[in-house]
Amino acid sequence: MAYKRNSYLKEHFSVVEPVKYILDAKEGKTFQYIPILQSLSQVLKNSDIQEKVLKSVRHFGSSCQYTSFHDGSHFKENTFFCGEELRLSLLLYCDDFEICNPLGTSRKKHKVTGVYWVFANIPSVLRSMLSSIYLSVLCKADDIKELGYSQVLDPLLRYLKRLEEDGLFVPCLGKIIKGTVFSVIADNLGADSVGGFIESFCGSHICRFCVG
């Protein structure tokens, strides 16, 4: 049944399949990466998304009020985004989640780290919708704690660099569009983990801001 379902999805839908990367062959440690450039291509085929992304060029930074981060100086003064040319701005989000009962005996044994991305070009009211959030990486949280983020994020960062330097050809628009990550979003523990800090609230400096 699973094979037939997968075959049907591949045939009738534009499925971007995950790619398995090996972290430690001896220990059988792996992670899954969903190719971001292919995902971007599929998402940009949606006419509604196209319309909102194209409109963003005219509206970014045009408000005299702070309605989103696009109205702030950090975005307006960014040389990559501040021009008239259309740029794709992405938000990355990192978080851990339990796939077992968090109060049961299997707590933390099967915790998974997910890395997601969202179009920052679309209106802020739409960014928190589940349909606007796309998965990029899945890895066991214990493997990341042992081996670090560098190996797990390597394929994602390599293709993001390609997006920034070479761009992505969008057939429906008939041109190459460049883009990059504007910011990385996470809760306090997730941000400390990505930044290489201790994930604890017990110390005298409980967050990365206290260190400074």
Range-by-range predicted roles:
Residues 17, 21-23, 34, 135-136:
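Generic detection of short hydrophobic beta-strand segments and adjacent strand-loop junctions
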Residues 71-212:
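Domain-level cores of phosphate- or acyl-group-handling catalytic modules
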Residues 1, 14, 45-46, 123, ...:
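Alpha-helix capping and helix-coil boundary motifs
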Residues 25-108:
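Structured nucleic-acid-interacting core domains from mobile-element enzymes and related host factors
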Residues 1-18, 22:
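Long, charge-dense tracts
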Residues 5, 21-26, 99, 212:
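General alpha-helical segment detector with a strong preference for membrane-spanning helices
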